[in-house]
Amino acid sequence: MLASTPSLASEPRIVICDYNLLLLAVTGLLRMSGYSVFQAYDAPAARELCRALPNIGLLILNTTGTGTDSPSLVREIREKHPHLPVLHIGPEEVDGMPADVPTLAETFTSDQLLRSVDALLPARKTAKLQ
């Protein structure tokens, strides 16, 4: 089993910025699916993780009800990681969010989450096929 575990140095990392119990469910599912996941409990923590961690492959945001300006957070993080894919989880699309950021409705299935993540992490998808 250890041989199939990806190297943390080369594996794209996922940073999740969320403030509620959804964070635990999403983090758990992604970790059980073999992803390297780092939790950020608020926008400042997400900024810090994205500054400090190498090889970030995806940012997942759910800032509903926090007062966080999600589009500004995405733009700020993309100053350092200009091509970073982002997945927004929420009840609806957010005005001003960059056009390339899809929204996954909060009432999603585990399969919908994994398909969304796989679609945004093409390097991992390619590695799975090899």
Locations of regions flagged by a protein language model:
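Negatively charged, flexible loop motifs adjacent to catalytic sites
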Residues: 45, 66, 92-96
